[in-house]
């Protein structure tokens, strides 16, 4: 169940608080009955899966055809995704730390906004208003992406959705003003691929898994960093995601002292179009066939377990490899080091006075989306309100 957040007002708290901390992620169905709606929203999102003019026709068709298969996958991992549980836990624990280290912006209120599953962005925004933010009362909210590496198809899509619902529930469509007085002031933590705390949390999980191999074999274990793939049409447009994922991998290997051979591979390709490779499943099969059977898979772009780790990596890739030497590093989940990293990132952002990173204001070279342009203008422009 979602954590109940009591209503708060500016007058009852510190001079700059309360602060809403909104964790953004793709989400996942909590039960098998929710799979159909989850897939319908996912395949309707042209930012994530671009199908062009046929999006409205092909999206529903693909989602209906895939629903029975995906329901079986969620049934195999316990009946639903744990991503909501972990997101609510991580955000709640982070806010407890922030209340201690940043009393001037306290209390910090945790919220979760998923792109394709409950709680959806619309639900989150409605709760913000019900809890005393905006609607003439002002207040600050931080959209904290839980994709460490930025992509227009993930963080960008979530921000497009947030911007849409902000306009519908607080903006011009509601009261006729683009920037109504007393609306929520937003800022964005839009990427954090090489934050030292993130790198340390990943590195310690890798070290823990390496320790399960005999000492004489340990240095020869191949580390396979696996991230969600992207369509090449998105990559060729100039999306920064591949470079930022590679930066995370390099930072983790640097922290490990480049102790092992390693490669970066990509998972979760959907459909016949070209996607970023090499694929994780093909990579594991290739090395096992060559006799390299000691492999550690590291989910490097995910902040918690979900279907891509618990089913795709654990039950498909590792199980089909058929060798006990093929293992997976634990996901970040409830790692205290990771949660402290989240708090450190948020603390630095709250003190920094900027509404987003310098990178976020720069569009991809091949971007032609007017929605993306207007969304970026909005969030970049919020810096003017933060300095008031």
Segments predicted by a language model, with ranges:
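Active-site-proximal alpha-helix that buttresses catalytic centers in soluble enzyme cores
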Residues: 2-388
